[in-house]
């Protein structure tokens, strides 16, 4: 995935930030969001 500078406590926290970044899916890795490009 593509790491973005958004802190998270769970993958759910990354859904919106990833959408806003123009990507989909979000996983929380090491307390940061990682998104999957479209």
From Swiss-Prot:
Major place of residence: secreted
Tissues expressing the protein: Expressed by the venom gland.
Cellular location(s): Secreted
A single MF term (Gene Ontology): toxin activity
GO cellular component: extracellular region
Pfam family, one: Toxin_2
Signal peptide: none
Record text about domains: Has the structural arrangement of an alpha-helix connected to a beta-sheet by disulfide bonds (CSalpha/beta).
Family to which the UniProt record says this protein belongs: Belongs to the short scorpion toxin superfamily. Potassium channel inhibitor family. Alpha-KTx 03 subfamily.
Protein's name according to its UniProt entry: Potassium channel toxin alpha-KTx 3.17
Organism in which the protein naturally occurs: Buthus paris (Scorpion)
Lineage: Eukaryota, Metazoa, Ecdysozoa, Arthropoda, Chelicerata
């Amino acid at each position: 995935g593509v790491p973005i500078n958004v802190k998270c406590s769970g993958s759910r926290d990354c859904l919106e930030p990833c959408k806003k970044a123009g990507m989909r899916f979000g996983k929380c890795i090491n307390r940061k969001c990682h998104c999957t490009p479209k």
